[in-house]
């Protein structure tokens, strides 16, 4: 059937607000160009009128200038109307885009709430409390193990009063040791020989002095 009657053309999508705004702005720009050309004509006619004398010729130029000015006013009105249309469409487009953004935000929030509910279903408060209890028990067991490993064997019990008394006495002994240390140094010094050294003989029976040299008999 399509060979005889042809295939229906697909319908073009309706223009969006953005397309309409672009079309209206383009028309407004075209009108601005026309107004600029009319301004140039008005300047030319105004110069001619200044140079001309009163009479039919001057009146004719004035009529032309008035027609141009009337056209300018009409174009300006059309331009203002198009500018208002463009502004209204931009406001509507902004409102629509804001609503779309709001819907996207709401959808994202709904999805987030759904995911949160799903996550909460997988987390049980009882399980968390059981885990906390297990961790606490394990920490207590670990502390008991450390105490058992650090236990000392055969250590006699000491009286705190005796230890404090020994500590005080130990401080006095240390001070006494520091005060008498110079006496120990003096006692350890070599003794000074007393009197004159005695005469000694070598293996040959000859008298020698303290250096082992033969003594010279006194004359």
Swiss-Prot record:
Protein name: Charged multivesicular body protein 5
Quaternary structure, from the entry: Probable peripherally associated component of the endosomal sorting required for transport complex III (ESCRT-III). ESCRT-III components are thought to multimerize to form a flat lattice on the perimeter membrane of the endosome. Several assembly forms of ESCRT-III may exist that interact and act sequentially. Interacts with VTA1. Interacts with CHMP2A. Interacts with VTA1; the interaction involves soluble CHMP5. Interacts with NOD2. Interacts with BROX.
Coiled coil: 26-179
PANTHER family associated with the record: CHARGED MULTIVESICULAR BODY PROTEIN, CHARGED MULTIVESICULAR BODY PROTEIN 5
The UniProt record lists the keyword Protein transport: yes
Functional description taken from the UniProt entry: Probable peripherally associated component of the endosomal sorting required for transport complex III (ESCRT-III) which is involved in multivesicular bodies (MVBs) formation and sorting of endosomal cargo proteins into MVBs. MVBs contain intraluminal vesicles (ILVs) that are generated by invagination and scission from the limiting membrane of the endosome and mostly are delivered to lysosomes enabling degradation of membrane proteins, such as stimulated growth factor receptors, lysosomal enzymes and lipids.
The keyword Ubl conjugation belongs to this UniProt entry's keyword annotation: yes
Taxonomic source organism: Mus musculus (Mouse)
Disordered: region residues: 1-21, 188-219
Entry PTM: ISGylated. Isgylation inhibits its interaction with VTA1.
